[in-house]
From Swiss-Prot:
Transmembrane segments: 6-26, 43-63, 84-104
Record-given protein name: Uncharacterized protein HP_1330
Source organism of the structure: Helicobacter pylori (strain ATCC 700392 / 26695)
Superkingdom of origin organism: Bacteria
Pfam families, A to Z: AzlD
Length: 115
């Protein structure tokens, strides 16, 4: 059983490593990315933010507590961070972490909606 778990972890590590290193092996100084790949690099950052916003708001029930307060807080943090820093990675990562912490801890629900 232990050997099986170790093999699974090893396969996951190698797969993750390969998917991370693959673009650098394919696109290098001798073989630069074409215009379409460069376009995807610019456009996908906005697409990822849009996808995260849709995922965030998909289960909101506006008419019952907590009225989407966790989602709205995370969404406003995306807007605020991106307007201030204009760094996509920061605008995606920190609000995602904030959203996950708020949803799993129920901190805002406890603060505003518990009697």
């Amino acid at each position: 059983m232990l050997m099986h778990s170790i093999l699974i972890i090893l396969v996951i590590i190698l797969t993750t490593y390969f998917t991370r290193i693959w673009p650098f092996m394919v696109f290098n100084a001798k073989n630069p990315p074409n215009d379409f790949v460069r376009y995807l690099g610019r456009a996908l950052s906005c697409s990822v933010i849009g996808m995260l916003v849709i995922y965030c708001f998909k289960d909101i029930h506006i008419l019952k507590p907590p009225y989407g307060i966790n989602e709205i807080t995370a969404f406003l943090s995306v807007i605020l961070l991106h307007r201030i820093f204009k760094v996509f990675v920061l605008s995606i990562t920190l609000p995602t972490i904030l959203y996950m912490v708020l949803v799993q801890s129920h901190a805002l629900e406890k603060a505003f909606f518990n009697p």
